[in-house]
Amino acid sequence: LKVEKASAAVIDATIIQTAGSKQRQAIEVDEEGQVSGQTTPSKDSDARWTKKNGLYRLGYKQHTRTDEEGYIEKLHITPANTHECNHLSPLLEGIAEGTTVYADKGYDSTENRQHLKEHRLLDGIMRKAHRNRPLTEAQTKRNRYLSKTRYVVEQSFGTLHRKFRYARAAY
């Protein structure tokens, strides 16, 4: 039972594999590192390939917003090959002004920080280092501080995968 409004929103994404057969065709990777979605040996035509931990997976990406206690408030499902930074705004709909939004480095972009500022939300997005521009010591400390709050969304994913067999989509 949830009684009061949340003062924080924690956002992250997880991969949901489809119940498809193993890869039968070569996977093509473009110059940006995106996996081509054209090779889909599954009945599920909306699922796409992505690479995680060195393994290719066919499926979807679930973007999730939880409150500071880990209760899931909003979901947004996309094909697995989409990048996280493009899918922050649908998760922020209906959030109260002044709420702190915590998110991992995948959501770090100028557009997302601007969106938070326009909607009067507090920025808790971890900073990402770019080529030839490593993080400063202050940014590294900030990321370490923010990661201590973000664990609740990882616990929610763990519960979904472990208790409810959320690892594979079936239809």
Name each region found by the language model:
Residues 99-100, 105-171:
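Helix-centered, glycine/charged polyanion-binding patches within enzymatic domains
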Residues 1-119, 128:
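Polybasic low-complexity intrinsically disordered regions
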